[in-house]
Amino acid sequence: MKYENKTVYLEANENYYKGAPKIKYLQWRETSDADKIAGVEQGTIDLSDPSGSKSAFDQIKSINSNGELDGDKIMVNATDNLGYGYIGINADTVKVGDDGSSDASKDLRKAIATVFAVYRDVAIDSYYGDAASVINYPISNTSWAAPQKSDADYKAAYSVDVDGNALYTDDMSDDEKFAAATQAALGFFEAAGYTVEDGKVTAAPEGAKMSYEIIIGADGNGDHPSFAILTDAKAALESIGFTLEINDVTDSNIMWDALNAGTAEMWAAAWQATIDPDMYQTYHSESVKSNYYHINDATLDQDIIDARSSADQEYRKSVYKQCLDIILDWAVEIPVYQRQNCIIYSPERINADTFTKDVSTFYYWYKDIENIEMN
């Protein structure tokens, strides 16, 4: 019908092929995330999609009289997001010498990645609670190609030392794990050619540095799922003489401009995935515009082509597992979290019995929008 004041006004098509929608008029309004839950509570919004964070779920529970996510004021539909959060490392700017594919360059990145990885559990639980889980491979858990914990060769990301020995045991405390990761980082730094003396990194090899920057779009105030990972990692690395500079930008375009220019060293972001897990756009060496990692591996390139050329899902899954292992060996990506998408609505104004059933990652609430009724 029209658009004005950041609102789209829509009128139902009575000749819609699935039947005339029960609701004749809709307004889609641009709203800040901070106002979405309160808007549904106060009646200015009927349905919305706030970020599914721990604080958001706690807010919803406090609004409902039963203290649950589904209650008299707000109903919640939460599904796994088709995508995942990660920390990236540029192999062209974080390397030893002039070869980002060398073992020394990989060891440098593994030193940093190992420290990042050990702080994921605490940070993600603090930010998301039950609304997200830590992942160990650079692929969304919603994908049929994602490795499962029940797989024989499944392992936590960056959980071994420079000699391939497991860093952690089930009975270790968090502090013991943090200490083990920091000690392992020293081993990787030394293997990369850094000078290590008395438990500290004292000098970098040619082409490498003692300080690197990571960019994160956390609104300048640390509001990001991975921000706590960075601050904890910064302190741990500084304790062994290595500096991690955190650049928390208020404008995320600064980060994306650096990625597009190939100048970023490290960054924290999230990928939006597709139903098919084709990896060409993100990891193939000829995908120059979106291979922000600058990973250039002939075996990986061929595996990506082989997997996308087959219709055999089991074969593709096994080849994609090989791809994931290569990406982790290059240490250009630290998988961080699989979060949930959240749709909330007011049962006081929307008839809950008519709301879309069996909402999932791949079946959105608006697939049956024509059946939804207002009270």
Which sequence ranges carry the predicted segments?
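Soluble non-cytosolic domains of exported or imported proteins
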Residues: E4, T31-D35, S102-D107, D175-Q183, ...
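Short, solvent-exposed loop/beta-turn-alpha elements that line the ligand-binding surface or hinge
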Residues: M1, P21, S62-T79, G88-D103, ...
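Append "and occasionally in soluble cytosolic enzymes with long acidic Gly/Pro-rich linkers
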Residues: Y9, D103-A235, D368-N375
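A local structural motif
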Residues: K18-R29, A208-Y212, A235-V249
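Solvent-exposed, polar/charged alpha-helical surfaces in well-ordered, non-transmembrane soluble domains
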Residues: E11, N15, K24, A34-A38, ...
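Bilobed periplasmic-binding protein-like "clamshell/Venus-flytrap" ligand-binding domains
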Residues: A123-D125, A192-D219, A270, A311-P347
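Extracellular/periplasmic solute-recognition and catalytic clefts
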Residues: K2-Y9, Q27-K95, Y119, D125-A131
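Periplasmic binding protein-like
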Residues: V40, I45-L47, A235-S290
